[in-house]
Design a protein with these regions (language model features):
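C-terminal binding/interaction regions
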Residues: 21
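Short, charge-patterned binding micro-sites
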Residues: 3, 41-62
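A structural signal for short, well-ordered beta-strand segments
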Residues: 6-10, 54-56, 88-90
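A short linear hydrophobic-aromatic micro-motif
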Residues: 38-43, 85-87
Length: 92
């Protein structure tokens, strides 16, 4: 069993409130779950209206598949129209 994790930091410059942030974060989480079949949670900075830290996890029997999927997720978030990609950490 191979477990992979991805930690991504994003910046929401236009977020005026925690409610604005929650709407964007929920949309991102739902899309990642649906498109990639992974577990996603906001893991840090919940009280900061502009910073988002997401944790993504997945399990597979092939390390290559886990790494490729998590890299695809990082690239998808890098291209997100609302959130600015700050950095990421990937572990397999």
């Amino acid at each position: 069993m191979i477990v992979g994790s991805l930690r991504v930091r994003l910046l929401l410059r236009d977020s005026r409130s925690l409610k604005d942030k929650r709407q964007v974060v929920q949309s991102i989480k739902d899309r990642l779950r649906q498109q990639f079949n992974v577990s996603v949670a906001e893991v840090e900075a919940q009280d900061n209206r502009q910073v988002v830290v997401l944790g993504v996890a997945m399990v597979s029997n092939e390390a290559r598949h886990v790494r490729a999927t998590l890299q695809q997720i990082a690239e998808a978030l890098r291209r997100h129209p609302v959130a600015e990609f700050l950095d990421h950490e990937l572990e397999v």
